[in-house]
């Protein structure tokens, strides 16, 4: 009784206070809902508070009380717990403002997770508060859960409302002040619809207010309408993704045929002429996929159809747009065999199909180009026009280099032969690089009037033999390793030689514009080395090719090289080499290849080619050197022997030397040199460095990198070179050339001179044949001088470069050449060290005129190439030091 009486007294007291203090009804409800009674807040109070929260004025009153309750502690833990319960209910059923405010004050609620209170009975009542605060914070931070809770609440409201007799939902409650503190209009102010949470009596102007004010009130009554209004408004403002009316509709349709199901929603949708679509858009999650209805309506939307490309907002607009896809084939049309300009095509695309895809395709040049491409080929009007790739963006005028690269091989046998090269090209002489193993294709290459115009200077494997070409050379051709035979191929015509330095020729397919110039290589001589000539004036290309050494001079199968080709015993060095290569191919590396060295991709040989033409050493520059075997000058005899050696066609670098065997027989002079040469057999340069012999040709500074020969031997030669510290890899060649050109090598020359002076005594002592070979060319031009050591000229020293000086540097072999200033050349790489070394670049020959030849084996191709010119004469001067040469071999051994 006591408890009951106490409860009654408290109720009366509250009632009195309300009347006396005039406490607002909403506030009173909040106080009752969060009272310290042992029971939880009544459902009717929660519903009233949730609904009142949609009125900004009442909302403020509610929240003030709640936040005050949350600050209670101790024995008033129920205030806290119930306040949390009210907030949790309002998150699902009330205004969205509540959610925002709870987030703002989340820190305050989080502190309640530490709430502690143990009642007199020893029970931990604080745990209730802790759990509730944690769950509320988690809910507010989880948008998905909020959306679920609010949707469920909306569904429940529909059930209650539809079950009411008049479609009205009157929450039960004992308070008569439900509407005392806010008019319907005031309450209608919607959270999220009003920019400021102002108290607006004119809220009726808002969309929802206006809609509901029309006739909903008559149908549903004030309360029902208001609740509906809240619900609709809150949902439309709801960012939490009320899955919309769909769930509500399902529940409505599933059993409640109330006027609400038939009327309220339909009426709302039709009220302002706003379709259900509008409501749907507002109510549906932005990120959610469109519903079927929306998708359909979108298709009918004028905006959509226009965007799709249709000019009229017809439902079929999308279909109209779709036709363009077929035009995806338009590229074919775009590239008619005639190569019609794509501009037209583009226009058609635009007109016919607004479809974005089509337009995009239209602008996609690569695709257009490809489709057009075939027509371009097809449309050869009897005139072999370069296959033009018509691209949407540009006329078909451009040749397709890319296509050339791949297509050339495929089309080698085709009549058009890709027509990539202007038909007017002079003629192509297939000059298989003697070494190129793959060359078969070359030999097969059918004569084609067209020459290859390859910007890169090395045509794809396919080399077209011009009908003009000497067939014999082609046969010998065999296979060339290098895909870009053109480089060697180009006959370096005499005219070209000067430019090419010989290197250029050897590397690039220097197209001698003149077939005549190519005559330099008599086909008869060429037989061993067919030459490929690209009529296409590739002079420009030559330069490039010159820079890049071919994979290696073709190794000819030691073709019988009639040195006779070059009577030039006279030219000794230059011609000699040439003849030795037997190649009229002189222009082409092939010629030199005869010497085993050809392998070296030395470009020198090519240079020598040029020389053959009697080109002065200069022009040949290094080129001559390659030929520079001349010391042998016994062209035919020696040549033949060398040729045999050349059989090896060692790969570049020293390999050639291995040929060492030397049919030293070469003529008397050649003896020493002969041996060396035979070893050097590879390209003249490769052929063991020039012979010390290089007698007379001091003027022609031939750089003899014969040292490469040494590299060839895998065993003894390598041992020597390594022991001497002369290990030079062709790689270094390029470095050398630049320095030599600059004249940086003088220091090296000085050092070498000193060393050479000491060693000059040991001319042909070289343990290695190479050494001999180099030595053999004692004099510059001197074919006879057996030992390089006796270098008649400073140049003589050059001879040793190859071997490290004739005998002296023999050990130098490949590298030895370096020893001398002229050794520069000898050093292969070292040569560069020398001023001349630069020139040697390629061969190193540059150094000493005659002996330079020896260097060729050196084939620094890489480095040398650049210096090619210098070598020639420049070096001689440098070489000037005659005596050193032999010694150079040692001193030079190291740059």
From Swiss-Prot:
Does this entry carry the keyword Isomerase?
A: no
Compositionally biased residues, Basic and acidic residues: 150-161, 177-236, 245-257
Q: Which CDD domains match?
A: ENTH
- Sequence segments annotated as region (Disordered): 150-396, 436-533, 758-784
One Gene Ontology term from the biological process aspect of the record: endocytosis
What PROSITE patterns does the annotation carry? Answer: ENTH (PS50942)
Q: Where is the composition biased (Polar residues)?
A: 349-358, 387-396, 464-479, 515-533, 759-769
Question: Keyword Transport, does the record have it?
Answer: yes
According to the UniProt entry, where does the motif ALPHA-ADR binding sit in this chain? 454-456
UniProt entry keywords in alphabetical sequence: Cytoplasmic vesicle, Golgi apparatus, Phosphoprotein, Protein transport, Transport
Q: Which Pfam families match?
A: ENTH (PF01417)
Name of this chain's protein: Clathrin interactor EPSIN 2
Q: From what organism does this protein derive?
A: Arabidopsis thaliana
The uppermost taxa in this organism's lineage are:
Eukaryota, Viridiplantae, Streptophyta, Embryophyta, Tracheophyta
